[in-house]
Design a protein with these regions (language model features):
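A general secondary-structure signal for short beta-strands and their flanking turns/coil
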Residues: 8-12, 100-102
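Ubiquitin-like/PB1-type beta-grasp interaction modules and other compact soluble beta-rich domains
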Residues: 3-5, 53, 80, 85
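Short, compact, well-ordered microdomains
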Residues: 66-110
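A structural detector for beta-sheet-dominated domains
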Residues: 16-18, 53, 108-110
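Short, basic/aromatic beta-hairpin or loop at an interaction surface
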Residues: 14-30
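Short, Lys/Arg- and Gly-enriched loop/turn segments at beta-strand edges
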Residues: 57-68
């Protein structure tokens, strides 16, 4: 029996920062007391865009923690896959794992 492996072309993925949340938008009363006052994530700006090239590396200046959280969806889109819970093809909405002040991203295969 012979197996043939076909390489799938990788595509670029655009990441757009849709919304940064302030802890007061997430909780009426914070479940923990931060060491320093927290506002919206300071690493991103709403509307900011990043490009993931065909090599799949994290874009320069992107938050490592957020990248770790959204990478599975980025990889799925880059290899031509789609998420079954969205009607739109080549699109995903993903969120970083900061539970107090999350950042929501739109991922688009281009």
């Amino acid at each position: 029996m012979e197996f043939v492996v076909k390489m799938v072309e990788r595509r670029k993925v655009k990441i757009t920062v849709m919304k940064r949340f302030n802890p007061s938008e997430v909780f009426e009363k914070s479940p923990v007391t931060p060491v320093n006052p927290l506002g919206e994530c300071e690493l991103f700006s709403d509307g900011q865009e990043f490009l993931v090239r065909e090599d799949g590396k994290m874009p320069e200046g992107f938050c490592t923690s957020a990248w770790h959280t959204i990478f599975c969806n980025v990889r799925t889109l880059a290899f031509g896959g789609d998420l079954p819970w969205f009607k739109e093809k080549g699109v995903a909405i993903s969120c970083c794992s900061d539970g107090l002040r999350p950042v929501v991203f739109k991922l688009e295969r281009i």
